């Protein structure tokens, strides 16, 4: 009888301790590591519904401080992103270095022309698949910058050629695409 009672007490104790440990992982009052915060920022950026191929946001997390960088096409995106990130558990402060691109009909036309030229081209069309296309097109007063990720140096070069041929940009295309070879698993 005593051993059965002791066994039940141990099981209940283990369940209580286990649920307390599980609660600790979701408790927003607990300190978060920079890696935890970074995962949260990445998740929020991937699920932000208004982030488009014409916006580009990057971030850095250090000691609970999130620094945001990049360009967006609308002021509401800048404030939305800032507010969303500021509410993440563990975030101490947000340094907002996001630039709002000027409103320009000419830039909007150029964005659409370049997007069509890149994403309708057979060797680059795969980068437009899914909810988050990997090539971003930033147009600031006619100056074009390509950001994001491609699989090969050839795709990076083709994207530059397609962007150059698409419209009347002011100056050369600033190609900041990163080449990341896909894993073969």
Describe each model-derived feature in a short phrase:
Residues 2-11, 15-185:
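N-terminal targeting leaders
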């Amino acid at each position: 009888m005593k051993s059965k009672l002791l066994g039940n007490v141990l099981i209940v104790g283990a369940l209580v301790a286990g649920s307390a440990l599980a609660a600790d992982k979701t408790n927003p009052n607990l300190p978060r590591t920079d890696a935890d915060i970074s995962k949260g920022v990445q998740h929020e950026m991937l699920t932000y519904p208004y982030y488009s191929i014409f916006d580009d946001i990057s971030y850095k997390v250090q000691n609970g401080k999130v620094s945001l960088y990049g360009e967006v096409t609308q002021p509401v995106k800048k404030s939305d992103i800032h507010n969303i990130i500021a509410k993440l558990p563990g975030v101490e402060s947000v340094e907002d270095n996001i630039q709002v691109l000027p409103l320009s009909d000419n830039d909007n036309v150029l964005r659409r022309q370049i997007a069509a030229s890149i994403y309708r081209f057979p060797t680059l069309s795969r980068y437009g698949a899914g909810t988050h296309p990997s090539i971003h097109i930033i147009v600031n007063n006619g100056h074009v910058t390509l950001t994001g990720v491609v699989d090969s140096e050839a795709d990076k070069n083709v994207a530059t050629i397609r962007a150059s041929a698409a419209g009347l940009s002011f100056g050369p295309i600033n190609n900041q695409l990163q080449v990341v070879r896909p894993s073969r698993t």
